[in-house]
């Protein structure tokens, strides 16, 4: 198992270049330049952290196994119970990450590519603290492996985990647990990890070695996941590359690519991503309800919403039959649902269009609304519902009672839903307004 000769050589070149630069510093220039001084201090802090951080393989393995064991033995996971144990595990892994002295440019680079936002490794290490998300995925992957084991494949189960980040938090803890408990051997399962960020690949490769999991890992690939090809079967795909409202990151493009690589009897996790739309008051949704409770949505708030219906279900059946329309060399779209806006009393004031995401990880386990950073509702600020903006902006879409909205999912550097108004709704709209005494 390796990250590839090219990654290793690039890593050595970067590290050597950094050492050469610091070998004979121009202290007067550093003193004048606050950015240079800041970079130097960051480097020193990181190296001090590395000196003070013992290689805690024993404690890291023990805490990981304890955390996974508690997840697998708990029928219903609760965020407030998981969080303390996961935070403790995060601190240990964060110390290890700091001790690697990965050059700052490889840790902090964050950019937008043709398929969406690519988060920096420094940002990705914190996602392990999204406790219920991590817990449900670990529980789901374990259940999915048990199901796949019944298929009696003639080869080890091959799991592919694209966009895995530096810690691969949705799978690596399970591998640690399996090895420690003797549950699955490397002859039964092996894994390919993929991440486009070199810093993430370096960190993950080091963590795999630190935990002694090399025999389970087929490769740690530092490539664009959409370019990954393999001649052998893929039996399971684990993918979570999205932000709230199924936006910003390239999950759908990646999911389509790996669905096409998956064995006919393979499993894709999450099994379903359910996106719905509603109309709500932004002030009530995002401000007022959290003044008294910051853990879950108020039932009163849920009742105040005007539910429009399902926008999109992303599951294996959809991915294997997904029809894309090419708009230009940079953008492809997928047509989703058309939903009608019911009658809105003009006195109600403006409404905000919200996209809601729920994630069915595996079986009956769902990651619900507000239970994770990826399941917070996303407002579409360009859709003006039941009002005319005082300061119109490019892209504003004015809609109201009786209008039908057709949603498209855009796959480009800014992935997410595009809302359009359907012309064929005009007749229904006029009838609705007339029935409510608002016709012309």
Feature locations, PLM:
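Intrinsically disordered, low-complexity transactivation/modulatory regions
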Residues: 67-75
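Structural motif corresponding to the C-terminal cap of alpha-helices
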Residues: 141-149, 178-182, 208, 212
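Conserved class I S-adenosyl-L-methionine
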Residues: 153-167
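Class I SAM-binding transferase module
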Residues: 2-59, 81-95, 103-116, 121, ...
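Conserved SAM-binding loop
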Residues: 204-205
């Amino acid at each position: 198992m390796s990250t590839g000769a090219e990654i290793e050589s690039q890593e050595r070149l970067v590290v050597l270049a950094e050492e050469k630069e610091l070998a004979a510093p121009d202290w007067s220039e550093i003193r004048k330049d606050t950015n240079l001084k800041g970079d130097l201090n960051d480097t020193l802090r990181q190296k001090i952290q590395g000196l003070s951080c013992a290689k805690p393989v024993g404690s890291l393995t023990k805490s990981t196994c304890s955390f996974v064991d508690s997840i697998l033995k708990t029928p219903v996971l609760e965020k407030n119970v998981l969080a303390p144990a996961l935070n403790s595990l995060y601190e240990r892994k964060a110390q290890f990450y700091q001790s690697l002295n990965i050059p700052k440019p490889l840790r902090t680079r964050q950019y937008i590519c043709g398929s969406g936002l690519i988060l920096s490794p420094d940002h990705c290490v914190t996602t392990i603290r999204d406790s219920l998300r991590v817990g449900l995925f670990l529980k789901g992957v374990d259940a999915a492996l048990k199901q796949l084991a019944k298929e009696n494949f003639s080869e080890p189960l091959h799991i592919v985990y694209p966009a895995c980040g530096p810690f691969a938090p949705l799978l690596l803890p399970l591998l640690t647990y399996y090895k420690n408990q003797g549950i699955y051997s490397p002859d039964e399962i092996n894994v390919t990890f993929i991440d486009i960020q070199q810093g993430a690949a370096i960190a993950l490769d080091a963590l795999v070695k630190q935990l002694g999991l090399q025999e389970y890992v087929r490769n740690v690939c530092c490539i664009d996941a959409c370019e990954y090809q393999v001649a052998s079967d893929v039996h399971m795909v684990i993918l979570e590359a999205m932000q709230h409202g199924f936006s910003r990151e390239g999950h759908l493009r990646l999911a389509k690519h790996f669905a096409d690589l998956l064995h006919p009897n393979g499993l894709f996790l999450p099994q379903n991503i359910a996106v719905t739309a509603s109309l709500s008051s932004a002030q009530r949704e995002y401000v007022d309800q959290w003044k008294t409770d910051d853990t879950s949505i108020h039932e009163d708030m849920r009742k105040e919403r005007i539910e429009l219906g399902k926008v999109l279900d992303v599951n294996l059946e959809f991915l294997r039959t997904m029809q894309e329309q090419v708009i230009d060399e940079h953008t492809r779209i997928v047509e989703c649902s058309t939903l009608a806006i019911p009658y809105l009393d003009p006195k109600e004031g403006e409404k905000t269009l919200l996209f809601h995401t729920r994630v069915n990880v595996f079986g009956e386990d769902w990651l619900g609304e507000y239970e994770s950073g990826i399941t917070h509702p996303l407002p579409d600020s360009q859709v003006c519902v039941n009002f005319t903006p005082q300061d119109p902006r490019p892209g504003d879409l004015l809609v109201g009672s009786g209008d039908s909205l057709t949603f498209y999912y855009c796959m480009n550097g800014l992935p997410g839903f595009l809302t359009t108004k359907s012309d064929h709704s005009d007749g229904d709209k006029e009838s609705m307004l007339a029935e409510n005494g608002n016709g012309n």
